[in-house]
Amino acid sequence: MHPDQIRQLRLQESSNTHPNLAILFIFIALAAVIVLLICLLSVILLLRYTRHGRILLKNTNPGELDDEALENEHIDEEGFSLLDDMGKERYLQAREFELNSMKSNVNTDAKLLDFLQVQEKGVLAWHFIPNQEYNCYVKNKTELSFLGNEECCMQTNLPLQRINEVYYFEVKLLDVPIDTLVSIGLATKPYPPFRLPGWNFWSTAYVSDGTRRSNSPFTGKPYSSFYQQGDVIGVGYKPKCNRIFFTRNGRRCAELPCTYRNLYPTVGAIGPCTLHVNLGQAGYVFIEANIKKWRLAPAVGSLAPPPSYSTSQPTISWDAASESSAGTTTQGDTNRPDKSKNRSPPINFDGTSYDAAGNVFSPSSSNNQAYQMHSMPATDEV
């Protein structure tokens, strides 16, 4: 082959190898960049989820804020500016109330006496505590009356249990003017009595304007349609997964997260209104709650009530008893010697009488009035 031809072939081969090397270099560079990004992302995730320290969470959901973060939390200036003078004052009062409650370490766990009360009375062990300072009153344990125009709320005496999968209760709006704002939900204790549920930490509520609030002192988020007089609002609590849902006239709404702390049924209002709470003492509007028995406790307690000592018992006449016993004496009894003459007289010290069992009955005793004592005639005894 001619040398010129050989030179041309070599030039063609070298020109063909240069593009291949460039493509190979590009692939190697891309692979290196991808590996570097993966390593960097792995390091970031490793540092984020393995680093020890205090976790600071926002107040988006109940229970997602620790006590130290609550103390160090800064006021949302933008939301605070949207409040009126009364709202700003209430917000600052509620914040001070929460900080004082956090420092006092109030124990809200259910006590043994509470469990015994639930076993004995069933669902009737729950009742709402009146808030008379803000003109909030309770009738028949579950009929709530808000008489003032101030913001206030009422809570039950016992928290919801954590044994069953779901606990449910309903609130019927009996008399609610148009300009009254009602908030129904769950909250922890101690909770500011001058605030609605959902406005402060560790509380969630469905508001009558159609919004829902979870630790939202400034604004609420759209949730469902508004409710008014005649509607029935239900609250369902799932303690196993810390979730809460609401119902409106028997129709279920979306679920929301809630805190792991002890929660109490809480109802609040701004303005006069009358509400009735069904904790399970009657049937629900929500059919599923009736079928699955989601009431707070059995309608009837499992323990028998103690005997009543206040009722008066029938008077026992010992004269009639002695006469009947004397009439049934046998012939053998009449032949026995008479020992009544040797019987000692009844013991009586300072007007105090003793019965056969040794029980004391003073003249001023209430038992003496219920069980009148009579002198027993002498009879033949062995």
Swiss-Prot record:
InterPro entries hit by this protein: B30.2/SPRY (IPR001870), B30.2/SPRY_sf (IPR043136), ConA-like_dom_sf (IPR013320), SPRY_dom (IPR003877), SPRY_Ssh4-like (IPR035780), Ubq-SigPath_Reg (IPR050618)
Domain B30.2/SPRY: 79-284
Subcellular location: Cytoplasm; Membrane
Pfam family, one: SPRY
Renumbered residue ranges of the record's region Disordered: 304-382
Main location: cytoplasm
Annotated transmembrane regions: 21-41
GO cellular component: cytoplasm; endoplasmic reticulum; membrane
Membrane topology category: Single-pass membrane protein
SUPFAM superfamilies reported in the protein's UniProt record: Concanavalin A-like lectins/glucanases (SSF49899)
SMART domains recorded: SPRY (SM00449)
GO biological process, one term: protein transport to vacuole involved in ubiquitin-dependent protein catabolic process via the multivesicular body sorting pathway
Polar residues bias: start-end ranges: 309-334, 361-372
Protein name as annotated: SPRY domain-containing protein C285.10c
Source organism of the structure: Schizosaccharomyces pombe (strain 972 / ATCC 24843) (Fission yeast)
